[in-house]
């Protein structure tokens, strides 16, 4: 457009320069014509002076010559008058020409001013149009860039949509796989929850068992300490018993030696008695029965003492057996205690591992709840974003309908503009034909004028030759001049008539052309204004479409961002799913470990129960032993009381025997020594009795201590068992309460899982709907891109048509200006031809 306007301005300037140059040429031609007329006038004056001289020279001729001279003078007077008239006419014509020239100059000056104004206006219009053209070119370049960018973006978006559709298909398949895996994981999760619940129950049981085992361990430790103390006491007692046993054995050895000695002495005494029997039969006869009684009693007492010694030896062997059995039991208890300590350490480690697993499971449950809440929030945000996208989609549909209406309106306007352009083209074609016809007529007139000028020149040449041959060919010249005058008059009249007709036709054509040009100019200006309005509307529509495209691109970016967010969320969910799988595998491994630990704990519990049963059996054995010991104690007490009674009786009898012995010693001197020996033997027996009494007392003390220890151990065991029973009852109540709470929590978790499953299904449906809406939006975006491309092509076509109309209008204006300039040239030439014709006629008249 800028190039076309600059070319139009240059064309108008060149046309103005051509007009000025033509006016200067016309002025120069008129000056030359005036100089030529003055020269011809000077030549005619010289010829007139020469003719007057010749007439003066010929005055002396004949009268005919005088008359001819008179006639010639009269003719000369006429010629002078004609010359003066022609001069006056020439002066009038010159004045008229000057006036016309001045008027023409003024007209040309006015036209130049108008043209300058038009030029300045055209310059301003040109500058404005240049600015508009620059802006339009910038906008067109921007539109082309935007179009190129939009095409690239559209291609990129198409590629992205294809990729996204592929990704969405993959995601759908993956979502289906995830749904299946989720269902499978849900079932596994339910199983794991059940197993976790069972593990929790077992863990609580194990904790309770651990607590009980800890209590049992404490009790076992206390019992072990008590057993160790008892063991140390028993060892001390055993050492004392061994010492006593050694002393008793030494005493028994001494007693056996004494018995052997006593038997030997008894044998000696028997021999002595048999020896002295004969001597003292009379003396002993009195005391024989008493001695027999005493011997029998002594034998009985000896037998009883031997029986008591055997009983004590049996008791000592039983005590040794009990000691060995207690030692073996203590060793077994130590081994069991070590086993219990090992099992307790294992159970403590298992408890710590289970506590760690429970804490990890709690942390994982908290993480899963947090992730579930985050997923719910993201789902709610996705629903809100989907609602926004629905609203934007509805707005885009409304904008699409508005654009469709505007496109339809623009298509109607373009159709009308096309029809108007077709009419304008048809009229321009007609004007071109009319201009061509007028140009042909102008060329014909120019040829006719050239022919007339050539004829005028020929006439002037002939007139000059006639003036040269005036004297010889006067009559012929008069006749020819008359003919020429008639021909010139007829030609002048014809030319004047033709010129008037042509000027009228030219004026009519000029008026029609100006009216048509003004009408076409107005029409074209109106059409250009309408087209500019349509272009502005199209630009606005294009800008709005660009805005809508930008909005839709932003929406697509938002959708792409949301899709990327959903992809990231899906990737996060996949990562979380993989983490959950790993966690599930770890939990399954930990569950297996927990199962193994639980089996170990169950086995340890069974072993502890077996140990408890064994401990109970041992307690019952100890109780039975205690009962046996109490029975033995009672029996020993009765035996001790009987032995004490026997000892009292023996002491009484011994006193009686002493008395009797004293009496017998008093009666028999030989019996004194025997009695003295018997007395010593009785003293030894008393010492043995005292030692046995001390041993019995020590055994009673030991039995009482053992009984007290057994009673204390039994009471402690019973108290511990009662506390354990109470603890087991409280633990059972707590476990039942926890079981109920865990069942309620499991029911809540099941409901929550069902709700989450429903939410996931709804989110999947919403995702499918969002994908469908995204596909529809992409299709609509492609349609709008195609419509935008068509609108841009239509705008480019309209701009090209407007530029073509502007060029055609400028060409029409140029042709109109050329026609005006050619018309002015024809008028100027017509004026110059008229003036030259008048001058030629005047010169011819002067020659005649």
Curated annotation (Swiss-Prot):
Task performed by this protein: Paramyosin is a major structural component of many thick filaments isolated from invertebrate muscles.
Main location: cytoplasm
Name used for this protein in its record: Paramyosin
Record's keyword annotation contains Coiled coil: yes
Keywords: Coiled coil, Cytoplasm, Disulfide bond, Motor protein, Muscle protein, Myosin, Thick filament
Coiled coil location: 10-833
Disulfide bond as UniProt keyword: yes
InterPro entries membership: Myosin_tail, XRCC4-like_C
Family: Belongs to the paramyosin family.
Pfam families in alphabetical order: Myosin_tail_1
UniProt-annotated stretches for the region Nonhelical region: 1-9, 834-848
A Gene Ontology term for the protein's cellular component: myofibril
Subunit record text: Homodimer.
């Amino acid at each position: 457009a800028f190039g076309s306007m600059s070319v139009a301005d240059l064309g108008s300037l060149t046309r103005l320069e051509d007009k000025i140059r033509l006016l200067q040429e016309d002025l120069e031609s008129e000056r030359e014509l005036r100089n030529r007329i003055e020269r011809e006038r000077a030549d005619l004056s010289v010829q007139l002076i020469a003719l007057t001289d010749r007439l003066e020279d010929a005055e002396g001729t004949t009268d005919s010559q005088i008359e001819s001279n008179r006639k010639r003078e009269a003719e000369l007077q006429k010629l002078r008058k004609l010359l003066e008239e022609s001069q006056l006419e020439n002066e009038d014509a010159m004045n008229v020409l000057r006036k016309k020239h001045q008027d023409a100059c003024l007209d040309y000056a006015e036209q130049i001013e108008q043209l300058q104004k038009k030029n300045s206006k055209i310059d301003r219009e040109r500058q404005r149009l240049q600015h508009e053209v620059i802006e339009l070119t910038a906008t067109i370049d921007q539109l082309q860039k935007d179009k190129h960018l939009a095409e690239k973006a559209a291609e990129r978006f198409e590629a992205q949509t294809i990729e996204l559709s592929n990704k969405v298909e993959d995601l759908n398949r993956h979502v289906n796989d995830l749904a299946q895996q989720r269902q499978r994981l849900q079932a596994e999760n339910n199983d794991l929850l059940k197993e976790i619940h069972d593990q929790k129950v077992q863990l609580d049981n194990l904790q309770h068992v651990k607590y009980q085992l800890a209590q049992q361990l404490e009790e076992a430790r206390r019992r072990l300490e008590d057993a160790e103390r008892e063991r140390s006491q028993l060892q001390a007692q055993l050492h004392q018993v061994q010492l006593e046993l050694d002393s008793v054995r030494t005493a028994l050895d001494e007693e056996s030696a004494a018995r052997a000695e006593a038997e030997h002495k008894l044998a000696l005494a028997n021999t002595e008695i048999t020896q002295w029997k004969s001597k003292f039969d009379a003396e002993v006869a009195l005391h024989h029965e008493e001695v027999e009684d005493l011997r029998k009693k002594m034998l009985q007492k000896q037998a009883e003492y031997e029986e008591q010694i055997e009983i004590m030896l049996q008791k000592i062997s039983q005590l040794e057996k009990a000691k060995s059995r207690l030692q073996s039991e203590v060793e077994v208890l130590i081994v069991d205690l070590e086993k219990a300590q090992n099992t307790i350490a294992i159970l403590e480690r298992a408890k710590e591992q289970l506590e760690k697993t429970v804490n990890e499971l709690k942390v994982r449950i908290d993480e899963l709840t947090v992730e579930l809440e985050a997923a719910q929030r993201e789902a709610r945000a996705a629903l809100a974003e989907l609602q926004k996208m629905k609203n934007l989609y509805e707005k885009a549909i409304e904008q699409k309908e508005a654009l469709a209406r505007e496109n339809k309106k623009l298509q109607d306007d373009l159709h009308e503009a096309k029809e108007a352009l077709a009419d304008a083209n048809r009229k321009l074609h007609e004007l071109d034909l009319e201009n061509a016809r007028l140009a042909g007529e102008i060329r014909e007139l120019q040829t006719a004028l050239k022919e007339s000028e050539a004829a005028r020149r020929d006439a002037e040449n002939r007139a000059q030759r006639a003036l040269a041959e005036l004297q010889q060919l006067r009559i012929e010249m008069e006749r020819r001049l008359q003919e020429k005058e008639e021909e010139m008059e007829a030609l002048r009249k014809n030319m004047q008539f033709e010129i008037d007709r042509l000027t009228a036709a030219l004026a009519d054509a000029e008026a029609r052309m100006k009216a048509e040009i003004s009408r076409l100019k107005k029409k074209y200006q109106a059409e250009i204004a309408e087209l500019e309005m349509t272009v502005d509307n199209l630009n606005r529509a294009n800008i709005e479409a660009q805005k809508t495209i930008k909005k839709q691109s932003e929406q697509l970016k938002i959708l792409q961002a949301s899709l990327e967010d959903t992809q990231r969320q899906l990737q996060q969910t996949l990562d979380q799913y993989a983490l959950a799988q790993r966690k599930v595998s770890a939990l399954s491994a930990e569950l297996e470990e927990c199962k193994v630990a639980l089996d170990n704990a169950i086995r340890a519990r069974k072993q502890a129960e077996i140990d408890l049963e064994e401990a109970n059996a041992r307690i019952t054995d100890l109780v039975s032993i205690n009962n046996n010991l109490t029975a033995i104690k009672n029996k020993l007490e009765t035996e001790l009381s009987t032995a004490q009674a026997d000892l009292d009786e023996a002491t009484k009898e011994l006193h009686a025997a002493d008395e009797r012995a004293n009496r017998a010693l008093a009666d028999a001197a030989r019996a004194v020594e025997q009695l003295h020996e018997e007395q010593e033997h009785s003293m030894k027996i008393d010492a043995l009795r005292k030692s046995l009494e001390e041993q019995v007392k020590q055994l009673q003390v030991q039995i009482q201590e053992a009984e007290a220890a057994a009673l204390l151990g039994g009471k402690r065991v019973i108290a511990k068992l009662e506390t354990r029973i109470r603890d087991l009852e409280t633990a059972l109540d707590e476990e039942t309460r926890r079981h109920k709470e865990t069942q309620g929590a499991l029911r809540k978790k099941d409901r929550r899982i069902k709700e989450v499953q429903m939410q996931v299904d709804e989110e999947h449906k919403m995702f499918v709907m969002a994908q469908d809406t995204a596909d529809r939006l992409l299709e609509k975006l492609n349609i709008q891109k195609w419509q935008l491309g068509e609108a841009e092509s239509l705008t480019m076509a309209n701009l090209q048509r407007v530029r073509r109309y502007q060029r055609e209008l400028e060409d029409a204006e140029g042709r109109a200006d050329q026609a005006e300039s050619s018309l002015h040239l024809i008028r100027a030439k017509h004026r110059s031809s008229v003036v030259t014709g008048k001058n030629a006629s005047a010169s011819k008249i002067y020659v005649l």
